[in-house]
């Protein structure tokens, strides 16, 4: 059997879990998606050519993505120009963040990973992987452009994101930072929000995913009070109220 982070998220509707923990992902607009794709393309090109990222390179990537796609979205030339100016401000913001400099080198773009959980394969995807060289143990940074309007707490508690972190974990002493990068239309700024997952937390995630995998495989609905009965297993994880990631 193959599972995805969405499968994990959709399955966790146990009534024993704290109320208000469900996260509904807001979809990106076409413009927001193109902003993320332009940054990824520029990062990938720099990685392949072993060159340094700058605003001009992101704008070049933007032009290759944006203008050919505008006709299919019925975006007129004037609107396309205005949005290009807006996008350029986001790209300038990105280049000002530490995440774009040599302390956070990009090692891969559009990456898929998988991990065996019991008799099941958990398959995940992340937009970009960077390494944080500002710390002695070189922490992994997972960069996501696909979600928006999530706080650090939302990121830390979301079952799908936690499953993704687990699949990219390489060792017991590894700390992983999950970073969400999104344009903010209200402030016209590129916003970076993140949560840090330490080794102990990642081990708790493994236990949670293992338990959910068994429920899916055995067709046990954790959202059915009749089937849950007096079971306190979900509550025993405390993974939705643990502050280790914040």
Predicted regions and their residues:
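Short amphipathic alpha-helical segments and their helix-coil junctions
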Residues: 1-6, 10-25, 61-71, 138-142, ...
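Structural motif
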Residues: 2-3, 22-32, 153-155, 220-226
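Nuclease catalytic cores
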Residues: 5-51, 84, 230-233
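Short, compositionally biased low-complexity segments
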Residues: 6-18, 34, 50-69, 174-186
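A non-catalytic, helix-rich entry segment at domain boundaries
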Residues: 38-111
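Active-site catalytic microenvironments for nucleophilic, acid-base chemistry
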Residues: 41-45, 165-170
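Non-catalytic protein-protein interaction segments used by genome-maintenance enzymes to assemble
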Residues: 108-165, 205-208
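Metal-dependent nuclease catalytic regions and adjoining charged, substrate-binding loops involved
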Residues: 168-246
């Amino acid at each position: 059997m193959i599972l995805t982070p969405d499968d994990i998220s959709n399955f966790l509707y146990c009534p024993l879990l704290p109320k208000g923990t469900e996260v509904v992902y807001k979809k990106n607009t076409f413009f927001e998606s193109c902003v993320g794709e332009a940054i990824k393309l520029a990062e990938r090109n720099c990685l392949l050519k072993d060159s340094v990222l700058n605003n001009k390179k992101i704008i070049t990537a933007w032009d290759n993505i944006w203008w050919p796609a505008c006709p299919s979205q019925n975006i007129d030339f004037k609107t396309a120009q205005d949005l290009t100016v807006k996008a350029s401000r986001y790209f300038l913001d990105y280049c000002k963040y530490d995440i774009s400099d040599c302390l956070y080198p990009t090692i891969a773009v559009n990456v898929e990973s998988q991990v065996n959980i019991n008799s099941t394969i958990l398959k995940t995807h992340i937009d970009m992987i960077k390494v944080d060289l500002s710390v002695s143990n070189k922490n992994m940074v997972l960069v996501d452009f696909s979600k928006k309007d999530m706080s650090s707490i939302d990121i830390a508690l979301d079952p799908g994101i936690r499953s993704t972190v687990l699949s990219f974990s390489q060792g017991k002493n590894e700390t992983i930072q999950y970073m969400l990068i999104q344009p903010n239309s209200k402030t016209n700024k590129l916003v970076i929000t993140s949560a840090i997952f330490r080794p102990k937390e990642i081990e708790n995630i493994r236990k949670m995913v293992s338990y959910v995998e068994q429920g899916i495989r055995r067709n046990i609905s954790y959202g059915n009070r009749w089937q849950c009965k007096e079971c306190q297993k979900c509550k025993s994880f405390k993974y939705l109220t643990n502050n280790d990631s914040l």
